[in-house]
């Protein structure tokens, strides 16, 4: 091996691979995962908290991929948008926001209407229904007609929870005496992020083309779709009442997570949009709850938080090269989210995007593109030029979301086989690998009543360190342990220690590494897999 070649430090993120002792509904324990099982038995390991306050969310709130990757890359607990927005509503500062005050004033002057587009869900991953309630209260106080274009969930919530949520929303609208639910659309259509423009087009057209309504309540329409075996995620775009977005109106997209809100927003606002043919609505005021993309011609209600000295930035400033690699479904997570919401790569940061399979749901292709991601990563590692490699395997999360137990087992087994190949390449390069997950999912596939569980969980996630010959941990004498009570915020400091780089003061996480002689003997957790 060339003495000048680089021995990489590789961060492998098993998206949605949570830890849970119980066997019932646990695809992780049901899957044959000999690689991970042997690693857990032979190498330093621990469990990390990946939900709630450990990642800047309310206590008891399940983690998610965006929050997980942001925390991993930041090396600190970052107050999440869910908390920022909820606090603004609770304190009343949202109702005094200058942007909202100006928009309400303009709508009153020109007789415009206020449209609220977003995921009507209690999941707290992309949005929260309480935020919509706050916005509807604002519109009612300003005496501006409100129209809700409800996107139904079924992924971060139970598959048939939408009827209950929308029935409560209709009661809230009646109590306010202002507003109607104009349209429904499952997130499968309205929140696609894989450039399946035919889905986005159906959602866009139901929101912008007027016509007669169904003459039924939202809950009644949902129950009718349930009878056709269509769950919340897959509700076809449907008009409940006249109320299309028109020139002179205002739209507020109240999702706070950007990745699944971008395509629909682009269709509304981009003059050079090419996803499908549509007229650009003139004189339309478009507001997004958070910044979805740096150059979108929209107004942003909650501006991005400025985070400095992120992991990628520290590695870049040290003059080291790094690589981010994932398939389409998780590409934004290892790039945009991992970099703290920064679109552009840092100097010396290369990126590889592998196309996800073009299927309706990923239980139809549980292998997804894991093999291709692994092939590309092995090729890159063989070049011996990257000091840090960040790789995401999407399968456990994306297939777990389908609720298909057998397909999720196949997804996990695929990842395990790919991990074996990847580790062989890292070992050959003398590198060190840190394997972990960003949140739970696949370890819980049905609830206590036997119904499919398609959401994330609050369970901890496994973390395994595979130390390489040319990346021995400084100061540990070749014998290192991972401490307990860690969180995702501790991962970036850990990687910096392995790389031999100083931890910046902005990173408040603590390295998970400790010499074996300083480790207090503790009960070992049970294995990751079978």
Swiss-Prot record:
Mn(2+) 2 binds at residues 15, 65, 438-439. GO terms for molecular function: manganese ion binding; phosphoglycerate mutase activity. This is 2,3-bisphosphoglycerate-independent phosphoglycerate mutase. Pathway: Carbohydrate degradation; glycolysis; pyruvate from D-glyceraldehyde 3-phosphate: step 3/5. Catalyzes the interconversion of 2-phosphoglycerate and 3-phosphoglycerate. Monomer. Substrate binds at residues 126, 155-156, 187, 193, 257-260, 330. It holds the Pfam family iPGM_N. The keyword Isomerase applies.
